[in-house]
């Protein structure tokens, strides 16, 4: 006899799932039947929010959906924040939960873990939520989820399985096989029109986002063909290498970059929703695209949001970029206007770098020092000062090396569990498994501090760089700037070194660049996590000497 839970595990294996994140509970034990005999590794967080963040980090690095097993009720309310972050950033996540038996759904009888409507609860943070009313539906609904991940705009999917369905005898479903879907190609007529507009442009510019991560090579070739400066969103860092002459970084919120965008006569936006946290991080407004806007996105709805285009193409970013290249290579291009291209991009970069203040320079030195010690590291960030700085000043050599929760939903506590997931997904990055660095502040770390124990247990050697500024400094600045007397921001901070060591984690505090470099190299030799604490005030003093 094979139960629904056992068939689920078999089907997940067939879809290439290698990791599952979850906390077993009385309602989910049947999800685990057969898991020990499978090839799937299970990682246990200390909170379901941690499971979701781990799945998120795993997906961002590996490109595969992160999968969670979650218990009815409190498990689902706990994971919704992580689903919200993944939804906002278009991250593939499969959340499989239990739910009350079919004859008790919505009954309001006070059953253990009961919610009036669990599926409705997560409806706003999931592409869809499906209640499995029969085990026979399982292959079809999994196929629907993976079709979305493979060919649509990837976002969290929730499948809830009633307790009585989980134990159904479904031997016949053992023969079920995965379904593979390819992304849509580019419509030839739209490609022709878009190619003609790009070919006639005298000042073309490209805005590329996380939706184009897998098109890095094509994007680079397209930019070089057009001589177009390229601005990347925060999650798209590394799509052009850091020293590429056409790269203008992720500085779309700054006046000088906005002026360059305003000069462009044709702007190609590919895989980006043109949203506030990438194009207006100071919330000042004023990002304008007066030139002809061309948009490429896998989601038709997204092509007309925020900034309506002159022309839109609904297609996979890589396929569309290749089609445009083929068209551009077959026709003459308009002469570029003045110094537009590498020279104009270089002038902008020089202007920006000359304007960084002392704090920005000190935090950029911190990030550069980490990268010098760990050249191919993956940086997983929280909402914290060095991350805000790096979002503006930091560029990397390859994609999927920089992402954080300061974009989109903007939650705190993300970075530590997401870094655990990122390390587990890192084996698929090539160039050997890279080091994974968690950038997090003292306030954010206290949201998910117990996940250090998860990292120890899972033997994931993540390097936690704790930037300690003694509370919620960014919010304190907002209060002061608005003439509000600061309240609730000067929080108590514990002995992080002592807590980390008590959880089984190596930990130390450092002063200056030399100690940071030595601590990072020592961390790379360990089999488990390391916490390195950097006191903000002390760092500023040390590097200014």
What kind of feature is each model-predicted range?
Residues 104-113, 261, 304-306, 312-314, ...:
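Thiamine diphosphate
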Residues 1-332, 369, 433, 461-464:
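N-terminal alpha/beta PP-like core and its mobile active-site loop of ThDP/TPP-dependent enzymes
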Residues 28, 48-53, 386-388, 512-516:
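Short acidic loop-to-helix transition motifs that present clustered carboxylates
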Residues 151, 374-375, 456-461:
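Basic phosphate/pyrophosphate-binding loop/patch that engages nucleotide-derived ligands
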Residues 8, 23-26, 31-36, 342-430:
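Active-site diphosphate/adenylate-binding microenvironment
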Residues 27, 50-51, 78, 118, ...:
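Catalytic-loop motifs flanking and including active-site residues across diverse enzymes
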């Amino acid at each position: 006899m094979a139960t629904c839970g056992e068939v689920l595990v078999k089907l997940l294996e067939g879809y290439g799932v290698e990791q599952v994140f979850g906390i077993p509970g009385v309602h989910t034990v049947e999800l685990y039947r057969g898991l020990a005999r499978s090839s799937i590794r299970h990682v246990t967080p200390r909170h379901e929010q941690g499971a979701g963040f781990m799945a998120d980090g795993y997906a961002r690095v590996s490109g595969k959906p992160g999968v969670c097993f979650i218990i009815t009720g409190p498990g689902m309310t706990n994971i919704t924040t992580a689903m919200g972050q993944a939804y906002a950033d278009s991250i593939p996540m499969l959340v499989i939960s239990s739910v009350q038996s079919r004859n008790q759904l919505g009954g309001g009888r006070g059953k253990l873990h009961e919610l009036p409507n669990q599926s409705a609860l997560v409806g706003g943070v999931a592409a869809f939520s499906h209640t499995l009313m029969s085990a026979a539906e399982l292959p079809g609904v999994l196929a629907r989820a993976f079709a979305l991940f493979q060919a649509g705009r990837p976002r969290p999917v929730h499948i809830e399985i009633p307790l009585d369905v989980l134990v159904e005898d479904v031997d016949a479903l053992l023969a079920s096989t995965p379904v593979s879907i390819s992304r849509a190609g580019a419509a030839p007529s739209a490609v022709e029109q878009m190619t003609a507009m790009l070919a006639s442009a005298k000042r073309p510019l490209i805005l590329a986002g996380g939706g184009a991560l897998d098109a890095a090579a094509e994007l680079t070739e397209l930019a070089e063909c057009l001589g177009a400066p390229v601005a990347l969103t925060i999650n798209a860092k590394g799509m052009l290498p850091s020293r590429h002459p056409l790269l203008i970084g992720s500085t779309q919120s700054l006046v000088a970059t906005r002026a360059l965008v305003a000069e462009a006569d044709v702007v190609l936006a590919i895989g980006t929703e043109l949203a506030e946290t990438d194009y207006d991080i100071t919330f000042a407004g004023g990002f304008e695209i007066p030139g002809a806007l061309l948009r490429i996105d896998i989601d038709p709805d997204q092509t007309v949001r925020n900034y309506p285009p002159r022309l839109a193409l609904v297609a996979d970013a890589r396929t569309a970029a290749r089609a445009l290249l083929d068209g551009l290579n077959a026709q003459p291009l308009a002469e570029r206007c003045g110094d537009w291209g590498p020279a104009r991009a270089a002038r902008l970069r020089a202007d920006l770098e000359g304007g960084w203040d002392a704090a920005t320079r000190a935090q950029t030195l911190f990030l550069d020092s980490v990268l010098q010690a760990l050249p191919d590291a993956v940086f997983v960030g929280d909402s914290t000062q060095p991350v805000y700085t790096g979002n503006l000043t930091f560029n990397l050599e390859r994609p999927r090396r920089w992402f954080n929760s300061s974009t989109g939903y903007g939650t705190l506590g993300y970075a530590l569990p997401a870094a655990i997931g990122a390390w587990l997904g890192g084996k698929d990055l090539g160039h050997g498994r890279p080091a994974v660095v968690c950038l997090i502040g003292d306030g954010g770390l206290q949201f998910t501090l117990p996940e250090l124990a998860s990292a120890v247990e899972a033997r994931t050697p993540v390097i936690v760089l704790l930037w300690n500024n003694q509370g919620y400094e960014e919010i304190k600045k907002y209060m002061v700037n608005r003439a509000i007397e600061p309240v609730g921001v000067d929080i108590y901070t514990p002995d992080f070194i002592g807590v980390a060591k008590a959880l089984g984690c190596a930990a130390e505090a450092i002063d200056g660049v030399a100690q940071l470099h030595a601590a990072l190299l020592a961390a790379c030799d360990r089999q488990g996590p390391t916490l390195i604490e950097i006191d903000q005030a002390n760092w500023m003093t040390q590097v200014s000497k």
